[in-house]
């Protein structure tokens, strides 16, 4: 069985209003959005947390494996971004948080990512937390919402509203940029990382 999902929005850094994932003004560095300390479980069944990302830029998104619409292209796009950043010599870790953690066990996440061409050398798919916890982190840190609803048919038993952005976080855990996860620009991400590195 599969589940339906729908995109949610992230607050605009300039107006305080919600904007969709294709918005051009994606610099949120002045807003001091910070990722709280965490230790979850990765696709290998091993602990992985914020301490493993200290001093590194990382790109985060929110997905679930039963999603039939936005998550497959997001995951494929993340794989493409991963390849392009490596070609450009830009070091960025990738982190995908499941918004369906009860179902998305480590082996489920690993098989899903493999199907979409993931390289696990710097891509970490996380689970091992409650829905309540990831919902709170998404709301408090990324100013977006996760909402589970009953599905519309036996084939779609679950509907999940979740963000479709890719979020760039710096080595201190501060969210500095976001991008449209359905149409990401790897060249722009690489340019932003290079610029932010120079500004350290």
Where are these regions (language model features)?
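C-terminal motif of bacterial Sec signal peptides marking the signal peptidase cleavage site
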Residues: 2-4
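Bacterial signal peptide processing site
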Residues: 6-9
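N-terminal "domain-start" segment that seeds a small globular fold
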Residues: 17-51, 76
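Short loop/turn microsegments at loop-to-beta-strand junctions
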Residues: 35-36, 58, 163-164
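Short active-site neighborhood of thiol/selenol oxidoreductases, capturing the structured segment around
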Residues: 48-72, 78, 94-95
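Soluble periplasmic/extracytoplasmic beta-strand elements of cell-envelope proteins
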Residues: 61, 94-98, 165-169
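Structural microenvironment flanking redox-active thiols in thiol-disulfide oxidoreductases
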Residues: 75-137
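Thiol/disulfide oxidoreductase modules built on the thioredoxin-like
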Residues: 130-192
């Amino acid at each position: 069985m599969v589940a339906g999902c729908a995109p949610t929005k992230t607050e605009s850094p300039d107006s305080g209003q919600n904007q969709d994932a294709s918005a051009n003004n994606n610099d949120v560095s002045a807003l001091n959005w910070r990722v709280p300390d965490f230790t979850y479980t990765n696709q290998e069944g091993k602990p992985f947390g914020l301490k493993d990302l200290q001093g590194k830029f990382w790109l985060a998104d929110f997905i679930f494996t039963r999603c039939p619409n936005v998550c497959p292209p997001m995951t494929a796009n993340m794989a493409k971004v991963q390849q392009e950043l490596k070609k450009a010599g830009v070091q960025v870790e990738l982190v995908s948080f499941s918004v369906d953690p009860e179902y998305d066990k480590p082996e489920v996440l690993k098989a899903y990512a493999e199907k979409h061409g993931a390289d696990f050398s710097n891509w970490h798919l996380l689970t091992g937390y409650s829905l309540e916890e990831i919902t709170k982190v998404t709301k408090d840190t990324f100013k977006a919402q996760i909402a589970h609803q009953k599905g519309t048919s036996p084939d779609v038993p679950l509907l999940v509203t979740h963000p479709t952005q890719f979020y760039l976080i710096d080595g201190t855990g501060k969210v500095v940029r976001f991008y449209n996860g359905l149409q990401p620009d790897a060249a722009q991400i690489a340019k932003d990382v290079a610029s932010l590195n120079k500004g350290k």
